Amino acid sequence: MAADSDDGAVSAPAASDGGVSKSTTSGEELVVQVPVVDVQSNNFKEMWPSLLLAIKTANFVAVDTELSGLGDRKSLLNQCIEERYKAVCHAARTRSILSLGLACFKRQPDKGEHSYLAQVFNLTLLCMEEYVIEPKSVQFLIQHGFNFNQQYAQGIPYHKGNDKGDESQSQSVRTLFLELIRARRPLVLHNGLIDLVFLYQNFYAHLPESLGTFTADLCEMFPAGIYDTKYAAEFHARFVASYLEYAFRKCERENGKQRAAGSPHLTLEFCNYPSSMRDHIDYRCCLPPATHRPHPTSICDNFSAYGWCPLGPQCPQSHDIDLIIDTDEAAAEDKRRRRRRREKRKRALLNLPGTQTSGEAKDGPPKKQVCGDSIKPEETEQEVAADETRNLPHSKQGNKNDLEMGIKAARPEIADRATSEVPGSQASPNPVPGDGLHRAGFDAFMTGYVMAYVEVSQGPQPCSSGPWLPECHNKVYLSGKAVPLTVAKSQFSRSSKAHNQKMKLTWGSS
């Protein structure tokens, strides 16, 4: 629980708090432990004030969900976005949210330009209406530590669709979502279209029939903007891959380099929770990259490209995210060296000054790989694997179709946040970054971290009345598309009736 002071502010953690990122005199970063507060029916009322305080004082809130399934994968990748929206709506009406992750990031300007206090919550939920749960979803979630016995015994109950009477003053998940809207904070997600649709149907109101009406509603619900870290990672940070674990670890590493160089960098602090809350807090480790890592025989091409492997923990190849990023960076550096050598030879042959020859691009991240029609429908939920923009070595390219067929046959609906390892309680004594990280609360933290780092990497923002990070403002990633979904209210779209009624309730009772 966040420590509440008399004036309603969140108290800062002590300087010696184990959750604070620190550096030794030798420059080696200590292990960072991220506290994730578990919220269930048995402590929901106790945590309610802290949840509200964290949301209201945050500068932005990152959200993630675990779902009971998604239904027909092919429809979810329909080239017609309107039809795709209808397919996601059908899934949201027939499936449920099993857990909700919230990560609230509050700026601490007195501690640095890019310093945040992060509070992370993992809410276990239980829909009280009939819903579909898919076997592959169950298998995947159990493999990554989801406790279904605990969910059915202690999940916070909720109902979907429209309100049943005046619920605005009750302590419920639906009211918590209403408080998130009232806070008028930027909402951050990763590959967030599915999350947005499920959040609306499960905690807000019945979904509108058209995508235009849905985006018009969203525009009014979140006036500070909706941000998608997959869009930011792929189109602005230009990472080689953009699945969540890769983007998070890449940002961590780049941030560490900037800190070591004395450049502007992101710093985080976490609340120093009392020992009485120990049973409700799950600490997740963020390890610094190993400088001398034993290299296995090979990296798993599937996991490297898509963030998911059908063999899971039984895969004999490496799923080490740091090793994958090391390999990508080495390949990119080799490519730059070869490009410079070609330029030098061409200049020598043409006897030209050192200007860049035509056809040679500037140094930068590896060129994006366009997947187009080769996308397989099973490669989706919060991530569609074929959308991952890897610049694979030749050996990977040759096996790409086989990998995709393997995914089509065996992949569960959740991929973007999937990791290859067993839950933390069964992890090896020498964990690899990413080991057992898959959880709505920690995924929300990773999502928020990526967005905070993108802010740092873009440099000082001009003082204006415009939106935060305008390049990413109200742009939601669309799998298989070169352009994002823009969240805006067009002159041809009206807000839905259910939304208008909800808005009156929201602001009339605030």
UniProtKB/Swiss-Prot annotation:
Residues 1-23, 332-402, 416-435, 491-510 are annotated as: Disordered. A zinc finger (C3H1-type) spans 294-322. Its main location: nucleus. The modification N-acetylalanine is found at residue 2. It is found in: Nucleus, Nucleolus; Nucleus speckle. GO terms for biological process: snRNA 3'-end processing. Keywords: Acetylation, Disease variant, Metal-binding, Neurodegeneration, Nucleus, Phosphoprotein, Zinc, Zinc-finger. GO terms for molecular function: 3'-5'-RNA exonuclease activity; poly(A)-specific ribonuclease activity; snRNA binding; zinc ion binding. The modification Phosphoserine is found at residues 5, 358, 428. A motif (Nuclear localization signal) lies at residues 335-347. The keyword Phosphoprotein applies. It is linked to Pontocerebellar hypoplasia 7: A form of pontocerebellar hypoplasia, a group of related disorders characterized by underdevelopment of the pons and the cerebellum. Pontocerebellar hypoplasia also causes impaired growth of other parts of the brain, leading to an unusually small head size. PCH7 patients manifest delayed psychomotor development, hypotonia, breathing abnormalities, and gonadal abnormalities. Interacts with U1, U2, U4, U5 and U6 snRNAs. Belongs to the CAF1 family. This is Target of EGR1 protein 1.
